[in-house]
Amino acid sequence: MLLAELAEVSRAVAATPARLEKIARLADALGRLAPDERAVGASWLAGDLPGGRVGIGAATLRAALEAAPPERSGPGLTVAEVDAALRRIAAVAGPGSGAARRRELDALLARAGNPERRFLAALVLGELRQGALEGVLADAVAKAAGLPAAEVRRAAMLAGALPPVAEAALSEGAAGLARFRLRVGEPVSPMLAQTAADVDEALRALGGEAALEWKLDGARIQAHRDGEAVRVFSRSLRDVTAAVPEVVALLRAAPEPRLVLDGEAIALRADGTPEPFQVTMRRFGRKLDVERLAPELPLTAFFFDALVAGGAELLARPERERWAALARAIPAERRVPRLVTRDPAEARAFLEDALARGQEGVVAKALDAPYEAGRRGAAWLKVKRAHTLDLVVLAAEWGSGRRRGWLSNLHLGARDPASGGFVMLGKTFKGMTDAMLAWQTDRLKALATGPLDAWQVPVRPELVVEVAFDGIQSSPRYPGGLALRFARVKRYREDKRPEDADTIETVRGLYGG
């Protein structure tokens, strides 16, 4: 398939808010991919690069696009050719790697038309937002392959990713999907929680009685044991076994020889309170001297679910049964603190105790719900005390899908008194109602300092917005080295001027907290 065809599908999918039309267009494209293009094509349509980032930043990409020659006629780029080029770029390393990546990128863009360039730019930066979430794409794979959507979703859950499932479904049908099952030693995508405003809302949503567990501000881990073989995986399914010898020892000491457990690893202070998230994450760096760092910064594992225990796979079993299996496998001090209640007052006290002890909050869980790997299920509801900052809007991006036609993805910055400017801390389109999107689009158009037909529109830094977020993390992507975690807009502060916004020093203070 030509890249231009895939770029047009992406544009058309972004242009329609209708789920069924998105599915139909995606299914048609998936069905036309050559066998060796199916996995990568599915990845791209999901907005992902199969191998992750390719080492090209926004500044390099912008310069390459500006230097690209005018469009010219000739043979179009194929999906396979572009995939090979991106893999070559990602593989470049060593002295002069930046210049070598730029040469490869220039050669690729020289053969691409403008729609293809826009598609590639969004793909490389991880910003291809076309309203084709994984659920929509899974339904499209099912439609293209003539298979039940539930079977495709379950296979993707167990595979930890949709692209290999798409390739198997399109190439082999039901027989291909049958290969995907939970195997000890191979990670599955973790179940995630939706958000509730408070524990009262969480209990109501879950039908009264629920289990409440501390939400630790640590690193999510999935620990597998098969005899003496132990493997530990991160939330992103990266093998981190070598980084966590404490977890390996705990699993080997368990009374059961076959286990798959879900939990958190966290660095604790001497008084038992948690270190900041970024301190825990020092143990998970890619260049890590574990023998030196582990004694200085030990990790403690706490588990809250069992996917395999007692000789059985437990994904489909109710939460209360999975907890009972976990309790038989792991001692109480290595399980998260837990309360089963239907009493809102008791639940509020449990939350306040967790917060007082430095934890993020609690997760409320439906006692009869299965483990929905890879899904942000309504059976788990997290309740946290959010932080807020007043930040300034520096730019905005045009939305896609339901947000098409609105400036929606806000670039947010903190005031820098030293320079008189602003330091970007991240982007978000979360938390905005349709009315807010319409209002801010009109205001941002009036403040634009660049062309309105560009994908990203810079604006005069005059609008102050109150932003809620869950934490602050280090990030080489932004000039200040910091980024907000899970930022969402609460409201615009029209009563505040840019000089009233929070400063980067305030943000650094929260980070060092």
From Swiss-Prot:
GO biological process: cell division; DNA biosynthetic process; DNA recombination; DNA repair; DNA replication
GO molecular function, one term: metal ion binding
Catalytic activity: ATP + (deoxyribonucleotide)n-3'-hydroxyl + 5'-phospho-(deoxyribonucleotide)m = (deoxyribonucleotide)n+m + AMP + diphosphate
Keyword check for DNA repair: yes
Binding positions (ATP): E213, R220, R235, E264, F304, R376, K382
InterPro entries: ATP-dep_DNA_ligase (IPR050191), DNA_ligae_ATP-dep_bac/arc (IPR022865), DNA_ligase_ATP-dep (IPR000977), DNA_ligase_ATP-dep_C (IPR012309), DNA_ligase_ATP-dep_cent (IPR012310), DNA_ligase_ATP-dep_CS (IPR016059), DNA_ligase_ATP-dep_N (IPR012308), DNA_ligase_N_sf (IPR036599)
UniProt keyword terms in alphabetical order: ATP-binding, Cell cycle, Cell division, DNA damage, DNA recombination, DNA repair, DNA replication, Ligase, Magnesium, Metal-binding, Nucleotide-binding
Cofactor(s) listed in the protein's UniProt record: Mg(2+)
Active-site residue numbers: K215
Entry superkingdom: Bacteria
Principal EC category: ligase
Known EC number: 6.5.1.1
HAMAP family found in the cross-reference section: DNA_ligase (MF_00407)
Family assignment from sequence similarity: Belongs to the ATP-dependent DNA ligase family.
Biological role: DNA ligase that seals nicks in double-stranded DNA during DNA replication, DNA recombination and DNA repair.
Descriptive protein name: Probable DNA ligase
Source species of the chain: Anaeromyxobacter dehalogenans (strain 2CP-C)
Organismal lineage: Bacteria, Pseudomonadati, Myxococcota, Myxococcia, Myxococcales
